[in-house]
Amino acid sequence: MERGNVVKIFPDTDFEHACQELENPQIDGWEFFTESHGITIYRLYNEKSGLYEYKIYGTLDDVLPDICAKVYMDLEYRKKWDTYVYELYETQKDDKKVIYWNIKYPWPMSNRDYVYVREMREMEYNGKKIWVVIAQSAMVPSIPERDGVIRVDDYKQSCVLTTDGKVGSRAYMHYYDNPKGSIPTWLINWAAKTGVPGFLTIMQKACRGYPEYLRSKQQAPGSSI
């Protein structure tokens, strides 16, 4: 199904629910996990996997939401500022674009890789412009598993951005994946409690540097943008 010339991957209701979460957080039954640097995290135990899924609410004080959305979607730029990226690319498979992402894990653990689809929509909700990105793992036989890398095939994420009414952004993220293998509990807790706020700080810096990155691309020999 297409909207204009854009393939619709996820149903409209998924985007509507994500918008609602930003304006009216649905946290009944969720456990408060941590709060740091303006970021609040809740978690919910998944009985099937024995892992947690997370809801993250926060603000990015000096970055506009349209820039955040562009940085979030720009894979080439991601490879420059995210040190955990080992390999990352987008490819066309059948009627949709698919992303392959190989993430560095600390030694002696194996890297994890993801094959997934995503969709971004710019929406109007309660009189506000909102950017919503939804991603989910996908089965793509032509991108087989690799030796020494663990394939994460149970992954879902939604990210919502809007203005904070000033010069920053309000953000909401819902995240779950099953990285498989024997990952220590302390590492999982660190990633959620410390890694998420730390990542958002790094992303905020990347957003500030995005205009300069685009200018450098335009000035590069052979540039077509």
What are these regions (language model features)?
Residues 1-225:
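Eukaryotic helix-grip
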